[in-house]
């Protein structure tokens, strides 16, 4: 999955950023940039920071790469497919770069942080100008300056995280905003490359996060999503204490107004009663939690180093429903992990049915070099994994459709995010993350709108404005 920077993330529809001009500095003409972002919300948020750095230096947003002075790729390496997309899009620029040698092509993000990845990228695409890692975001403008006049690719990959909290930012997802609360991951699941490219966990302080959320709500943002590879680990590294439940309480206590608060992602082993209780008592926190399952087989979970059992996971589901009976739970699930038997797969389908997920991101295991799982025996044949994922998707899609159908006739509140030109309807999400479409005679973007659900289709709700 990738996102052109000018696209609105939640709706993934063509929403061009408004641009009110930029400081000219000493440039003879208005220089432009284009960012293509792959992967998760964390990457999208880092693209907002890179855009802020560029606009602070006088650049303006281009709507196509061919009209930009700087073309920037923010990459993902969570699965092989993500890397292949990056290679394809960079390769497509070879002729354009040859015809426009002054155009700067820069590649950063998780893919480049992998061991030997930068050199591989340089050899494969020698026309790329700058390659930088996940910890070099703060240095991007310096790297551009150092590259000026150099013919060879400039590579800078460091292991020490830069603190990018105060980086200038151009947000692209109004009325939604992303706020990092914790960086990195300490879990080392055997299939996952993230700890190797994102580093160890580092939490921002509660006052720092609260101040950013307060500023965003004061500026008119209506939905704030707190981000981290594992938000449930928030505060473990802070000397003065405070965990994620304390953070939710602090935001609820100090940030007033009508807004929604979401967060992602949560590791099941770290989901506590304290946190679930904090969700329940803070009225701005949405009753939606993304709780990655990955597998419903205890044997597979052990080989994944997930550090919980299927019984532990279902206990977390029961805990959530105890405090918030209406809470929607979404998840991540993979098939085809090394050694996954037919019974392991059936165990996963069983727990998906019992947990009754509102929605799920389902995918086939992807080998990642440098992870323990890559060296495990009994890699699953592609045809077996494909058959399993098709069966899983069909079962979950039917379940998701049932969840949607239960909405019919209900009145819900939607935060309007965009206008769908093809449908001729406004769109937005309710508290539980369900997408709703409706018509209105006025521009509703950024507004909370009460609607009645008249029909459903899969995950979508079709509504009438009240």
Model segments located where?
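Short, positively charged and aromatic/hydrophobic N-terminal segments
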Residues: 2-10, 15-26
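Proteins enriched for Cys/Gly/acidic motifs involved in redox and nucleic-acid/cofactor modification
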Residues: 25-234, 274, 311-322, 346, ...
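Generic beta-strand/beta-sheet core signal
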Residues: 36, 227-229, 264-266, 292-294, ...
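Radical SAM enzyme [4Fe-4S]-AdoMet core and its adjacent flexible, acidic
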Residues: 40, 235-254, 304-307, 367-398
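Conserved SAM/AdoMet-binding glycine-rich loop
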Residues: 104-107, 114-116, 218-342, 353
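Short flexible coil/turn linkers enriched for glycine and charged/polar residues
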Residues: 172-175, 185-187, 285, 295, ...
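Conserved, mostly hydrophobic/aromatic
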Residues: 189, 209, 226, 263, ...
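Terminal RNA-binding accessory module
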Residues: 375-466
């Amino acid at each position: 999955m990738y996102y052109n920077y000018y696209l609105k993330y939640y709706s993934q529809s063509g929403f061009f950023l408004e641009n009110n001009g930029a400081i000219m500095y000493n440039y003879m003409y208005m220089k432009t940039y284009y960012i293509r972002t792959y992967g998760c919300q964390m990457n999208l948020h880092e693209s907002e920071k890179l855009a802020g750095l560029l606009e602070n230096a006088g650049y303006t947003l281009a709507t196509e790469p061919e009209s930009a002075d700087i073309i920037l790729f923010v990459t993902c390496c969570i699965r092989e497919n993500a890397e292949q997309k990056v290679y394809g899009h960079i390769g497509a620029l070879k002729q354009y770069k040859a015809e426009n040698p002054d155009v700067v092509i820069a590649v950063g993000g998780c893919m480049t942080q992998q061991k030997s990845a930068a050199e591989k990228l340089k050899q494969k695409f020698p026309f790329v100008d700058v390659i930088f890692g996940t910890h070099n975001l703060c240095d991007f403008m310096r790297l551009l300056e150092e590259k000026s006049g150099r013919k060879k690719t400039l590579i800078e990959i460091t292991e020490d995280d830069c603190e990018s909290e105060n980086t200038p930012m151009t947000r692209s997802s109004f009325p939604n905003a992303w706020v990092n609360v914790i960086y990195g991951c300490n879990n080392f699941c055997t299939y996952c490359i993230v700890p190797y490219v994102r580093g160890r966990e580092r939490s921002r302080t509660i006052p720092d996060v609260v101040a950013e959320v307060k500023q965003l709500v004061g500026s008119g943002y209506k939905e704030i999503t707190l981000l981290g590879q594992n938000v449930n680990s928030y505060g473990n590294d802070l000397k003065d204490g405070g965990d994620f439940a304390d953070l939710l309480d602090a935001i609820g206590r100090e940030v007033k107004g009508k807004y929604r608060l979401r967060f992602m992602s949560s590791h099941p082993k770290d989901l506590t009663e304290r946190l679930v209780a904090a969700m329940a008592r803070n009225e701005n926190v949405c009753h939606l939690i993304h709780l990655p399952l990955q597998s419903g087989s205890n044997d597979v979970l052990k080989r994944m180093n997930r550090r919980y059992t299927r019984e532990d996971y279902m206990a977390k589901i029961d805990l959530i429903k105890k405090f918030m009976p209406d809470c929607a739970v979404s998840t991540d699930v993979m098939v085809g992990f090394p050694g996954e038997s037919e019974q392991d797969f059936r165990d996963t389908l069983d727990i998906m049915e019992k947990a009754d997920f509102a929605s799920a991101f389902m995918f086939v295991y992807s080998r990642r070099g440098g992870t323990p799982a890559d060296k495990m025996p009994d890699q699953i044949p592609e045809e077996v994994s494909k058959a399993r994922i098709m069966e899983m998707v069909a079962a979950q899609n039917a379940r998701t459709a049932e969840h949607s159908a239960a909405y019919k006739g209900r009145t819900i509140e939607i935060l309007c995010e965009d206008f769908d030109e093809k449908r001729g309807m406004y769109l937005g999400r309710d508290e539980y993350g369900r997408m709703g479409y409706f018509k209105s005679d006025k521009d509703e973007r950024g507004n909370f709108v009460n609607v009645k659900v008249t029909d459903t289709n899969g995950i979508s709700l079709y509504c009438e404005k009240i």
